[in-house]
Regions:
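N-terminal nicking endonuclease/strand-transfer module with a His-rich metal-binding environment
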Residues: 1-173
C-alpha cells in the first residue's frame, strides 16, 4: 500500500462500504472482524495515529516511495477440506500467525470475507520496526515471502489444510 487513497480503497472493500461487485450480499452477515480497528477509525486514521506515536517522524518526513502498509489475503480454498474442518479454528490460527509475524500493535485489522467465491481474510499491516516504517524489515526479498507461506502452513496444518498453489500470486478482482 503506497498511498492514502489506497488505504481508503482497501477500507471500503474490506468493510463493505459501497457496492462490491464480486460479493454476494446474502452472505455478508457471515463476514467477521477478527482483529478490529479501534472504534471510529479507518485505515487512514490508524496509520496517522501510529506515525504520530513515533519520535522519528517528528523530525523526518515519510519517504515518497515508502510502503505505508501491507495487505495479506489468507485463504483456505473451497475444495478438499477435511470433514472436521472448523472455520473458527482456522481464523484463530490465522490471527495468531499475523500477531506473531507482524506484532499485534502493527495490525490495523483482519477481516473475514465469507461473501465472495472463496472465503478469505484481508489483513492490513502498518510495517513499523525499530520506530519507523520499514516494509523491508518484514519482507526483504521474494524468499521472505516464500518463507511466510511456509510459516503460515505451519500454523494452519493443525486444522487439516495443505498448501494448494504454493507461491502463486493472485490478483484480486
Amino acid at each position: 500500500i503506497h498511498s492514502m487513497q489506497a488505504f481508503s480503497a482497501k477500507f471500503k472493500h474490506n468493510y463493505r462500504i459501497g457496492a462490491i461487485p464480486n460479493a454476494n450480499e446474502a452472505y455478508s452477515h457471515m463476514n467477521e472482524q477478527i482483529i478490529r480497528l479501534p472504534a471510529g477509525e479507518t485505515y487512514n486514521t490508524f496509520f496517522e495515529k501510529k506515525l504520530m506515536e513515533l519520535p522519528y517522524y517528528e523530525t523526518h518526513k515519510i519517504r515518497k516511495n515508502a510502503t505505508l502498509g501491507l495487505e495479506f489475503m489468507l485463504s483456505y480454498g473451497t475444495s478438499g477440506l477435511p470433514k472436521d474442518f472448523s472455520v473458527k479454528e482456522w481464523m484463530e490460527k490465522s490471527k495468531q500467525f499475523l500477531m506473531d509475524q507482524f506484532g499485534k500493535e502493527n495490525i490495523a485489522s483482519a477481516v473475514l470475507h465469507m461473501d465472495e467465491g472463496t472465503p478469505h481474510i484481508h489483513a492490513v499491516i502498518i510495517p513499523i520496526k525499530d520506530g519507523k516504517l520499514s516494509a523491508r524489515a518484514f519482507l526483504p526479498d521474494r524468499q521472505a515471502m516464500r518463507d511466510l507461506h511456509t510459516k503460515y502452513y505451519q500454523y494452519t496444518k493443525e486444522v487439516g489444510l495443505e498448501p494448494e498453489n504454493r507461491y502463486m500470486h493472485i490478483q484480486h478482482q
